[in-house]
Amino acid sequence: MQRQLGHKRYQPIWEMMHKLRSVMGERDSKYNLEGTIELDEGYFTRNNDSAKDEDEDENQKRGLGSQRKSKVLVMVESEKADNPKPSQKSRKCGHLKMKVITDLKGETLKSAVECSVSPDTTAVMDNFASHSTVEKAVSKSERQTVRGCNAPKVLPWVHIAISNAKSLFTDMYHGIKEEFLQEYLNEFCYKFNRKYFGDRMFDRLVIAAVSYKPTFEHKLYNGRANCG
C-alpha cells in the first residue's frame, strides 16, 4: 500500500490500514449470524515482541496451551448442502465472524456468542466442556465428537476459515502481535463475507469508512482515532 500510494513514510500508512480494518470490524458487528452455525476455537501463533520473550518461551508450554498462541472463537453460518457431489462439501457457508478471546472458559465463550449470533440460532460444535455453557446462548445445539478424520465433515467451514487465515497471516505478515490480531481478523472476515462482491468491495469499504468511526488507537499521532 505504501508503494501504491507513493508515500515516503511507512508509519502513517500502517496506521491508516489498521483504522480501515477497525472500520471493517465495526461494519460487520452490525449484523448477527443466523440459522445454523459452526463453532470452534482456533489457536494463532503470535509474534514475539522481543528477544527476551523468545528466551522466556523456553519455559513455556507447547501446543494448544502455549502462551504464544492467541485464542480465537470462530463462527460461520453453515447449512447442509442439498445432494452435494463427492467433490463438494457437505455444508455450504454464509457469513463468518472471528473474535479474539482471553480464555476458553464457558462464560467467556457464551458472552462472545451472544454478541455475534441471533438467539434462535442452532450451533454445531464439538464436545469441548465449555461448549455446554455456550448452549445457553442459542436455541438449539448439536454437539458431536470431532476427531481429525471426521472434522472436515462435521465442521468443514470453521476449519477452512482457520486454515486460510493462518496461511494468509504467515505468508503476508510473517507474524502478528496479539494486540493487533483482531484488526487482521476483521479484514479477513470482511473480505470472506464479501467474496462475491468483486469490484464493488472497494466502493462498499469507502461507504463504511465514512459511516463508522474507527476504534483503533495507537501511540502514533498521540493516539488520535481520526485518519490524518
List each model region and its residues:
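Residue-level recognition of single "structural anchor" positions
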Residues: M1-G228
